[in-house]
Design a protein with these regions (language model features):
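Active-site-proximal loop/helix of nucleotide/amide-processing enzymes and allied scaffolds
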Residues: 1-30, 38, 47-50, 72, ...
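Glycine-enriched loop-and-adjacent helix/strand subsegments that border the catalytic/binding cleft
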Residues: 31-74
Length: 172
């Protein structure tokens, strides 16, 4: 849950802390292994889906991950955050943003999960999660660039393309 008394000055301090931590941490995945990610630019939802969907699309359960990107949307890191059931996966707000705070050069994030049914249509829970993520991104001053849901046969749903990223200035 977000601390609603989080002030802009605390946000600025958080940004500085993130910069300091990033200067001293190697790039690692959620299992602690050093990550080697391809040099690719995630400049639009279609490209992001083409690059990230193969990492989770064929799973028999829902998998939720976060892509950390640079100012020019270069993929810096990919972190699988949770694996759930055929119908859902748990998502913790801190777990979504911690990898971004610890990945050097991160200036934005994209969250991605699959629908094992193959139908990328978002559920009401997916929409609520996106709004919560937009609010958390605002507090952290870290843009949430998109929430992608991937299905089968290269199908995907982009909350950005659908205009459903909420009223988040950081997410625009």
């Amino acid at each position: 849950m977000l601390n609603e008394s989080f002030s802009p000055s605390a946000s600025t301090r958080g940004h500085r802390v993130r910069e300091l931590v990033c200067a001293y941490r190697p790039l690692r995945d959620s299992d602690g292994r050093v990550v080697d990610v391809p040099t690719v630019m995630l400049t639009d939802p279609r490209t992001a889906a083409a690059v990230l969907a193969p990492l989770i699309a064929d799973q028999s359960v829902e998998v939720f991950g976060v892509a950390c990107v640079s100012t020019k949307h270069r993929l810096l890191a990919w972190h699988v955050l949770s694996r759930g059931t055929r119908a859902s996966t748990p998502v913790s707000m801190p777990d979504v943003f911690v990898p971004a705070c610890l990945t050097p050069g991160t200036t934005g994030v994209m969250v991605v999960h699959n629908h094992p049914s193959g139908d990328p249509t978002p559920s009401p829970d997916d929409a609520r999660l996106t709004l919560r993520l937009c609010a958390a991104a605002d507090v952290l001053d870290l843009p949430l660039l998109d929430h992608l849901i991937v299905g089968d046969e290269h199908r995907y749903f982009s909350f950005r393309e659908a205009g459903l990223m909420g009223a988040s200035p950081a997410g625009r």
